[in-house]
Amino acid sequence: MLKEKYDEAAIRDLICDYRDFHPFPKGDERQLVEGLPDCLQKRWIEAGKRYLDFSWPPLPAVRFMDFKRNGNRSEFEKLHFKRRNVLATLVLAEYMEGKGRFLDQIINGIWAICEETFWGVPAHNYVSGYPDAPLPDVNEPIIDLFAGETAGLLCWTYYLLKSQLDKVTPLICRRIETEVKRRILDPYMERDDFWWMGLLSIRPVNNWNPWCNSNCLTAFLIIEKDRDRRVKAVRKALESLDAFMAVYHDDGGCDEGTSYWGRAGASLFDCLELLFWASGGRINFYNEPLVQQIGRYIYRAHIHDEYFINFADGGARVAIAASLVYRYGQRIGDQRLVDMGISAYHLQAEKRKQYAGEIVPASLLRQL
C-alpha cells in the first residue's frame, strides 16, 4: 500500500537533505523558541532544575541478568528509564531557557547512555542471536523498542542542541553519530530478520513495527548524511509499515486493545508525520482510507472521559496523547478526532498541574 505509492526514484526526488530537515525550531533559534507559551517554558525549566545535581545511576550487569535468573525485569528498567527521562527533562529545560546551565548534565547523560553496552531492556534480549544469553552481545547490536527509543532521544537532543553542544566540543555530537550509526542505522540497513520489520515470515507484527520504525526513521532523517542510505531507509520503512497495515481490517481496529493504540496507530502517525515533514508535505498518506480508519478507531472505542472499551491488553482507562490525536484529526480532516484531542487536553489539565515540575517522559518527539 505505502511502498507502491513512492518508488526509490520518487523518494530520492522528494526527501530533503539532512541539513534541511527542520520540523521544529532549534535551540539556537531563540526568537522562535521564546515565542512558546510562558507556562510551557516554565514547566520544563522547573522540571530540569531538579536534576542539576543528579547522579547518573550505574546499570550493573547483574541487574540485567536478573531477568534470566529470577524473571525480574523491573530493577534494571528503573535505572534504564531514569537515565533517559532525566536526560529528556534536561534537554527540554535547556531548549526552553537557552542559558547553558543544563548543558553539563546533558553531556553527562549523553555520555553515560553512549557508554551502555545495549540500549534495550533484558526482556527484549531474545531478539538477538543468543536469545537465552543473560547479557547482551556487544558484537550484535539489536533494535528493540527501547534501543530505538534511546536513539530517538539522542537524535532529537542532537537536533535541538547541536549548536550549543558543539561550542563545548564537537566530540559530543560525533559520539551520538557514531553510536546511532553502529547500533541503529547499520543494523536497520543490513538486516531483514528483526521479526518486527515484517519482511520475513517470522511471526505476525504488532505495535513494535511502527514504534521501532518511527525511531529508526528519526535517526536516518537527523543523523544520516549519505543520501543513498536515507532514500533506501525510507523505502525499507515503507515496506515494513506495509506489513503492519496488512494485519489491519478495513475498520482500522487495533486488536491489541485501546491502550496499545498509542504505540500502534499513533506510532504509524509518527512515521507518516516524519515523512511528511522530510518531504515538505509531498510524501503524504493521509488520504489512504486505512490510515484514516486507524485514526478513527480511538474515538470509536471511546466511552466517556478517559474510559474506553477494554479488551485484549487494553485497560479501561487510557490517557491518550492529546496533541497527537488532535494533529492526526487535522491531517485526515476528521473534526471528531480533533475535538477528542482538545477534550483530552482539558481533561488532563489537573494532572499537568499536579505533576508540574516532575520528570518528562523520554519520548521527545511526543513532547515536541
Task: Give, region by region, the residue ranges found by the protein language model.
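Non-membrane alpha-helical segments in proteins
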Residues: 82-96, 108-112, 148-159
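Carbohydrate-binding/catalytic loop surfaces
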Residues: 64-75, 125-144, 196-207, 211, ...
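Structural helix-adjacent loops and short alpha-helical linkers that scaffold large soluble proteins
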Residues: 94-107, 157-181, 220-238, 275-291, ...
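Long, well-ordered core segments of solenoidal/helical folds
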Residues: 48-59, 106-124, 172-197, 232-252, ...
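Extreme N-terminal leader/anchor segments
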Residues: 1-44, 92-95
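Carbohydrate-active enzyme catalytic cores, enriched for enzymes
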Residues: 266, 270-368
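Active-site lining segments of carbohydrate-active enzymes
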Residues: 133-257, 270, 348, 360-368
